[in-house]
């Protein structure tokens, strides 16, 4: 499971998800990407389940990049606990995702394989997503 090694504050305020992603909204490393269309908290377990689904489908070919990291702890109090007596203990870690954010990238596989792998990964996530291709400024260097 993904989580930070150390954090400055153990129990921060809960993060907001207003607005669109202004960073991380283009495919930069790979050729294909999976883009979020809704705001959400994505847990480290969901990221790991998506990663496993993708890598199992592409087998030994290609490379996968995870473009989000769960760096925010979400606290919870135990069940049937009276109110008060402080904030609960950190329960799990989330990545705050805004619409437009690229979640995963992939390279080294055909478009059909990438599309199917991303579809399998998207089923593990709690949001609507979209398959996107890399867009170069002056076209791709390999084309011509």
Swiss-Prot record:
Matches recorded under InterPro entries: Ribosomal_uL16 (IPR047873), Ribosomal_uL16_bact-type (IPR000114), Ribosomal_uL16_CS (IPR020798), Ribosomal_uL16_dom (IPR016180), Ribosomal_uL16_sf (IPR036920)
Basic residues: bias regions:
1-14
Q: Where is the signal peptide?
A: none
Job of this protein: Binds 23S rRNA and is also seen to make contacts with the A and possibly P site tRNAs.
Instruction: State which gene encodes it.
Output: rplP
Source species, domain of life = Bacteria
NCBIfam families under this entry?
Answer: rplP_bact
Positions of the region Disordered?
Answer: 1-25
Subunit structure, briefly?
Answer: Part of the 50S ribosomal subunit.
GO cellular component terms, alphabetically, are: cytosolic large ribosomal subunit
Q: Which family does it belong to?
A: Belongs to the universal ribosomal protein uL16 family.
The taxonomic lineage of its organism, from the top, reads: Bacteria, Bacillati, Bacillota, Clostridia, Moorellales
Keyword terms, alphabetized: Ribonucleoprotein, Ribosomal protein, RNA-binding, rRNA-binding, tRNA-binding
GO MF, one example: tRNA binding
Originating species: Moorella thermoacetica (strain ATCC 39073 / JCM 9320)
> What is the protein name for this chain?
Large ribosomal subunit protein uL16
Tell me which Gene Ontology terms the entry assigns under biological process. Answer: translation
């Amino acid at each position: 499971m993904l989580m930070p090694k150390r954090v400055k504050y153990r129990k921060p305020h809960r993060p907001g998800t207003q607005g669109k992603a202004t960073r991380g909204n283009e495919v930069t490393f790979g050729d294909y990407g999976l883009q979020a269309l809704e705001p959400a908290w994505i847990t480290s377990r969901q990221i790991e389940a998506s990663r496993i689904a993708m890598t199992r489908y592409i087998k030994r070919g290609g490379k996968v990049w995870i473009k989000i990291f769960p760096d925010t702890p979400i606290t919870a109090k135990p069940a049937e606990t009276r109110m008060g007596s402080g904030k609960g203990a950190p329960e799990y870690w989330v990545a705050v995702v805004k619409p437009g954010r690229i979640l995963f990238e992939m390279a080294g596989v055909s478009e059909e394989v990438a599309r199917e792998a991303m579809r399998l990964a998207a089923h593990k996530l709690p949001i609507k997503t979209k398959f996107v291709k890399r867009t170069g400024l002056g076209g791709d260097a390999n084309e011509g």
